[in-house]
Amino acid sequence: METRRCKICAAGARPLWDEKFKIFYFHCSRCQYIFIDEKEIVSPEKEIALYKQHNNTLENEGYVNMFEAFISKTILPYQERIKRVLDFGCGPGPVLAELLKRRGFEVDIYDPYFYPETICEQKSYDLITATEVFEHLKDPLETARLLRDHLNPCGILAVMTLFHPGEASAFKNWWYRHDPTHISFFQPQTFEVLADRLGFRVLMIDSKNLCVMERAGK
């Protein structure tokens, strides 16, 4: 298997064979992005069916607590500059959007499967959230570029996706990749490179799953 072009930094990504599931991933040593062989990507129909199995509702206390922690760490520190929000990839139950509305933010939602017509191409936002979204993206750089273009100057992109453990052996034993809809995996370094390529300024990256970036002002 030959190397593939990294979708984040364009360097060569070497093949990583998964003996258990008999599939190839590709690992970029420059930016640490890992992505699945495209022929293994599940169909939209299967992807939707898998999403519908999730218990992502306001009645799920653990799910709500996850978003409350996300809000506390990535949104509240910048709340004075945020009025209009887009919850990108909100899924069938837009819980984060509801929690933000309760705090007084104006919130739009978008999901390519469940709310595909709710985004206005002419709108721009002070904040775009993408929680548990980037691991599902076939081309995360282009999606991030699209989101950047919907941000106001100095607008914020807040991302939550679990960072992969790095070493090949650890990655192969990592539970997070067992979801067949998870096809892209990141580390903090990946988002630093992505931000540099798209003209974002990194405001915060933790060591687990969070990244906050700011679009350049005019």
Name each region found by the language model.
Residues 81-82, 152-154:
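A general structural motif
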Residues 162-167, 184:
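Short "lid" loop at the C-terminus of a central beta-strand within the Rossmann-like core
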Residues 132, 136:
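A short His-aromatic
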Residues 137-138, 151-153:
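Helix-to-beta-strand junctions that scaffold the AdoMet/dcAdoMet cofactor pocket
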Residues 103, 150, 198:
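Conserved dinucleotide-binding and phosphotransfer motif residues
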